[in-house]
């Protein structure tokens, strides 16, 4: 059993697993998996790791089996878990943007709105939330739990509609389905057990995890640029430079040149560097960022 000065951390199995482990590594924690082992190693003597399904994570955190963990907002709502939501961490297996739970029907079906499904059968893994959604809208439907391959249920005639999660909508369309409504936007959240959150050691450890994870996410898509600029060229260079904050500028020793350092989005670099060079910047260096705190 982990002691009072040990944080019990839950890592989600399945679709979020690889992205989560990669994010932790970028944040400074290396999680080492072993074949068929639910308790991976982590390079922090104050943390123990457990693997569990994202669908179950919030229940384990609420009960205190885990002090904290990462799971989707959708599963916290589905389980109606009473936990502390420490932070939103917007990342997923495909992209760094929220996923959507959508209501979808066959592309050639007559259903256009949720109201059109009154009295119909809906298949989903997110049963509790779906029942609450339709009940709140005053639309009587039959909600059936789906064990997987939910998109195929409509095609096979086993359901009139599905409620399924998607990031891009590509898989939904590939199965001959049409989205008629977005029901929920969801993203990964860092959650904590309420008692653990009141413990000074555990709360501080969770806050450090959050700070570093957020910093790693914030750094994605950003790069640093460093360059030397003649003093007389600085006004033109400054007019061109975007930055998270004002550029850092320092005098070079015994020269009428300045060292300039900025952080920019990676997508603009291929156009920005030639313009900087044309304006007189030299020794331009681009470097990757691991974290932006």
Curated annotation (Swiss-Prot):
Its cofactor is Mg(2+). It catalyses: 1-(5-phospho-beta-D-ribosyl)-ATP + diphosphate = 5-phospho-alpha-D-ribose 1-diphosphate + ATP. Signal peptide: none annotated. Feedback inhibited by histidine. GO terms for molecular function: ATP binding; ATP phosphoribosyltransferase activity; magnesium ion binding. It comes from the Bacteria. Pfam families: HisG (PF01634), HisG_C (PF08029). It is found in: Cytoplasm. Keywords: Amino-acid biosynthesis, ATP-binding, Cytoplasm, Glycosyltransferase, Histidine biosynthesis, Magnesium, Metal-binding, Nucleotide-binding, Transferase. PROSITE patterns: ATP_P_PHORIBOSYLTR. Pathway: Amino-acid biosynthesis; L-histidine biosynthesis; L-histidine from 5-phospho-alpha-D-ribose 1-diphosphate: step 1/9. CDD domains: PBP2_HisGL3. One of its GO terms (cellular component) is cytoplasm. Its EC number is 2.4.2.17. The keyword Amino-acid biosynthesis applies. It is an enzyme of class 2 (transferase). PANTHER family: ATP PHOSPHORIBOSYLTRANSFERASE (PTHR21403:SF10), ATP PHOSPHORIBOSYLTRANSFERASE ATP-PRTASE (PTHR21403). Belongs to the ATP phosphoribosyltransferase family. Long subfamily. Catalyzes the condensation of ATP and 5-phosphoribose 1-diphosphate to form N'-(5'-phosphoribosyl)-ATP (PR-ATP). Has a crucial role in the pathway because the rate of histidine biosynthesis seems to be controlled primarily by regulation of HisG enzymatic activity. This is ATP phosphoribosyltransferase. It comes from Solidesulfovibrio magneticus (strain ATCC 700980 / DSM 13731 / RS-1). The gene is hisG.
